A protein has these predicted regions:
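Noncatalytic alpha-helical scaffold of FAD-dependent oxidoreductases
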Residues: 1-298, 302-309
Length: 309
């Protein structure tokens, strides 16, 4: 809508849309974006568009910029305008920090740029979001499996207790409670994954949310309450961090004015399973792009990972 409006405006007044860049919420988190909105208690927006609107007449530029803000408002968005040189520089600074997306993987990522027709862009971002939801749920199921393996090993690490109680007495049925909890949560998450096509709107809007903190960590702290069980809880957190480190996800930033989308997958180069999962995601991304009448050769052309497609 912005692009169409600006194309007409260029013919009418000569005001140009010189650039239009996009960052999704994963990129916003990576670059440390400080939201300008007063809504949502400071939460990050789902995406940010940064545009350069230029012209010879300052009043015309201001009028057209206000129209772009109005378009954003009609789509539950907000618009913020930088007029001075210093303010404009700050607006564009976040876009320049996009390499931060792979800082947790020592700057290693699979970068697949594709070009999508602008009228199909929303379908592409939805498709990527579905891939991300599936990857997240698969990682959550792997976490459950790792936790069940930990509880099945027998002896759990225990701290000192002021009372002279044996480890067996301390644990009593706590392990069984923990196992039942994990199995119950795992069954729910597995059902969501199996029915992701139907449940996608609820999962995308976080009306359904697979949460380690609320569904597993908090109940575990209740089951294993007391000083003697601190080592158990510490080990559960270690397991979570280890499994989370291998989670694959897809982040998007794009030259939104022409449909060139950088589809980036940060990976640990020494994690074979993670690399395999990432390449499976690439295959789905290529199919998705072409199904929307897009092309898989963006501004960076064809590289090793695209060769087979």
């Amino acid at each position: 809508e912005i692009k169409d409006s600006m194309c007409e405006e260029q013919k009418r007044s000569g005001v140009l849309l010189a650039g239009l860049e996009h960052l999704d919420d994963r990129y916003l988190k990576a670059v440390g974006y400080a939201t300008k909105s007063k809504k949502g208690n400071g939460q990050l927006p789902k995406m940010v568009l940064v545009g350069d609107i230029v012209g010879d007449d300052a009043d015309e530029v201001a009028r057209v910029t206000s129209e772009v803000v109005r378009i954003a408002n009609t789509r539950s968005g907000e618009g913020f305008v930088a007029v001075s040189s210093e303010a404009r520089k700050k607006f564009w600074l976040d876009r320049k920090r996009t390499a931060a997306i792979s800082k947790h993987t020592n700057a290693f990522k699979i970068n697949e740029d594709v070009v999508i027709p602008l009228p199909r862009m929303a379908e592409y971002t939805d498709g990527i979001e579905r891939i991300n939801i599936e990857l997240s749920l698969r990682n959550k199921l792997a976490l459950c499996d790792a936790l069940l393996e930990f509880f099945a090993q027998g002896e759990l690490p225990l701290g000192q207790s002021e009372d002279r109680i044996s480890a067996a007495e301390l644990l009593e049925d706590r392990v069984h409670q923990a196992q039942a909890l994990v199995q119950q949560v795992r069954a729910q998450w597995a059902d969501w994954l199996a029915n992701v096509a139907t449940l996608f709107p609820e999962l995308q809007e976080h009306r359904l949310r697979a949460s380690w903190k609320t569904q597993l960590k908090a109940p575990m702290a209740h089951i294993f309450s007391g000083q003697a069980f601190q080592p158990v809880l510490a080990e559960l957190n270690k397991i979570h961090q280890r499994v989370l480190k291998g989670r694959v996800w897809v982040a998007l930033h794009m030259h939104a004015g022409d449909g060139n989308v950088h589809t980036n997958i940060p990976v640990n180069s020494d994690d074979y399973a993670m690399l395999q999962t990432a390449h499976e995601a690439v295959a789905r991304i290529m199919v998705l792009a072409r199904s929307l009448d897009g092309v898989i050769s963006g501004e960076h052309g064809i590289g090793i990972t695209k060769l087979e497609f």
